[in-house]
Structure formats: structure tokens, C-alpha cells
Amino acid sequence: MISKPDKNKLRQKRHRRVRGKLSGTADRPRLNIFRSNTGIYAQVIDDVAGVTLASASTLDKEVSKGTKTEQAIVVGKLVAERAVAKGISEVVFDRGGYLYHGRVKALADSARENGLKF
């Protein structure tokens, strides 16, 4: 009998494949997304120095209410504001192997509206 594929392993495989071609620099850091069942996390990362420059997640106090998609919109707004405050305006978007749809798209659109270019 054919077993069902593990969705998370397939996502990790996609993410590894994309990360081979994609990296963040000090001039244009990487906006990384991680999506769990209960929350969404976003980090702006300089891969050359190995440093997180800005981050936001549903664990922040400002993001406690609403649906998961509404929370993703607030997380996108927060991470964009924190990155712009540190002088970062352009990033490389790393969707983490997730489809560009739903919460990931909502976060990306919100980050774009609040000053990040990608």
C-alpha cells in the first residue's frame, strides 16, 4: 500500500532547495517565515554575519487577538516597522517552503504595505 507523504518533510525539502539559491546580506537581508499550527514567526536575517536583525511573531503582546490570518497581517506590519526602524528597506523573501497563499501571503502583503520592498 502507498503511504501518504509527510507534508512537513516535503516542505523542508522545498525549503532546503530554495535556500541553496537564496541568502541574505547586510544590504539586503532575508525575511524568513515559519508557520506553525498556532502561530506565525518572521525574522529579518543577515546570513553573512549570522545575525537576526528584526523579528516578530504571534507571541508578541501586540498580536494576541483575531484569526490566524489577521495575526499574520499584524506580524507582517510589526516586522516591517522594526526593520525600517533599523534602516532596512529591501529584503529577500524566504517563504520557508510554504505555498505563497493564505497566512504567508497576508504577512508578505502587510510587510510590503509597511515599507519593505521585495
From Swiss-Prot:
Any one GO biological process: translation
Matches recorded under InterPro entries: Ribosomal_uL18_bac-type, Ribosomal_uL18_bac/euk
GO molecular function, one term: 5S rRNA binding
Pfam families tied to this protein: Ribosomal_L18p (PF00861)
A cellular-component GO term for this protein: cytosolic large ribosomal subunit
CDD domains: Ribosomal_L18_L5e
Keyword Ribosomal protein: yes
Biased composition (Basic residues): 10-20
UniProt-annotated stretches for the region Disordered: 1-22
Keywords from the named record: Ribonucleoprotein, Ribosomal protein, RNA-binding, rRNA-binding
Keyword Ribonucleoprotein appears in the UniProt entry: yes
Subunit architecture: Part of the 50S ribosomal subunit; part of the 5S rRNA/L5/L18/L25 subcomplex. Contacts the 5S and 23S rRNAs.
Described purpose of this protein according to its UniProt entry: This is one of the proteins that bind and probably mediate the attachment of the 5S RNA into the large ribosomal subunit, where it forms part of the central protuberance.
Family per record: Belongs to the universal ribosomal protein uL18 family.
NCBIfam families according to UniProt: L18_bact
Name recorded for this polypeptide: Large ribosomal subunit protein uL18
Organism, scientific name: Streptococcus thermophilus (strain ATCC BAA-491 / LMD-9)
UniProt lineage: Bacteria, Bacillati, Bacillota, Bacilli, Lactobacillales
